[in-house]
Amino acid sequence: MKFLAITLIVHRPDPVTGIRKPTRDRFREVLDNALLAEELGFDGFGVGERHERPFISSSPPVVLSHVAALTRRIRLFTAVTTLSLLDPVRAYEDYATLDHLSGGRLELIIGKGNGAAQRELFQVTPDDQWERNAESYEVFRQIWRQDKVTAATRFRPELTDAEVWPRPYQQPVRVWHGSATSKESVDLAARYGDPLFSANVTHPIEPYAELIRYYRERWEHYGHDPGALAVGAGSAGLYVARTSQEAVETYRPVFEGTLAFQRQAGLPVVFETVEDFVERSSALIGSPQQVIDKVHRYHERFGHTVLHVHADASGLTDPRHRDSLELFQSEVASVLRKDIPDPPFDWGPVLPTPSTTEEPAHV
């Protein structure tokens, strides 16, 4: 099993202290967490993309380029790239550049994105967001694979023998499809034979397990090799301590502060107490053995081989945040790496393959 640390770069008051850091300090914290993730042996570091409050993750290629300059080994993920909002040509240019600067460490998780405010900002409607996502991905995918692209697009100017530079480092970059609530992204992933990354954050296990089951069904429908299928999954929170009692009591003020924010913002509340959150959500809060057991329970339902945890302290003090990550790596990840297999591909740059025959995009 491989392990990622991911941030959406939420920028709001600390759920425990009520203090909001200056924007510059919040970005510095992201960079520090990326360095910590590499130091502790995480396999990847991811940055989300949101274009509305309370997030400041509107430019993941810029942030990841800085992370690439500071690190040497860790793979760099987007989580997720909101292709339904983006011009696929510009998205390709940004990420192909980042891929070169990082020496082929880039992996993308793509999706339509969430939030009404960012849809309004980019004039994307709920009715066309899935079509935009599919069209943008097909064009993006072809640009990465072909020197010239022709595409009869609906949501951007058509392309005719278009050349887009720089040509890529990885051939091709690995693209995962983020999945949260709907079957459209799952089917898109299965259609192209791409890996799936389940959000697995907001709700109990059942809806996510059903979408992963559907992904496997569609993967088979499209005739792909069952042995090449790969699934990743997120987690709703992380705090590992020596005992379950210590973990829950330390995390309690973090949970209660976050719950208060959700209620103030009018967001739906799924878990009313920290005990319910620990029991029924995907949060990894407890002793090392409890966390190991919980990941195994989820693996039995998902069959996932990649797991992401929160990169941010999210209300924990910096020493407790570091102690938790260190304990996770030394006593949890070390066991799970042996118990659960890796994804069915090399964890490194995708080597060049012979050029494919140019085909027009059917969008």
Residue ranges and their predicted role:
Residues 1-71, 75, 171-173, 345-352, ...:
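N-terminal beta1-alpha1-beta2 module of alpha/beta enzyme domains
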Residues 2-25, 85-151, 195-197, 202-207, ...:
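Flexible, glycine-rich active-site loops centered on histidine and acidic residues
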Residues 3, 37, 41, 49, ...:
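Conserved, mostly hydrophobic/aromatic
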Residues 3-5, 45-47, 76-79, 106-110, ...:
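Hydrophobic faces of well-ordered beta-strands that scaffold small-molecule active sites
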Residues 5-10, 127-164, 205-305, 337-363:
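An alpha-helical appendage that flanks or caps ligand/catalytic pockets
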Residues 13-27, 81-89, 171-181, 279-288:
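Active-site mouth loops of central-metabolism enzymes
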Residues 44-66, 82, 114, 200-203, ...:
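Glycine-rich, proline-tolerant flexible connector loops at the mouths of alpha/beta enzymes
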Residues 54-78, 132, 136, 326-340:
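Alpha-helix-loop-beta-strand connector modules within alpha/beta enzyme cores
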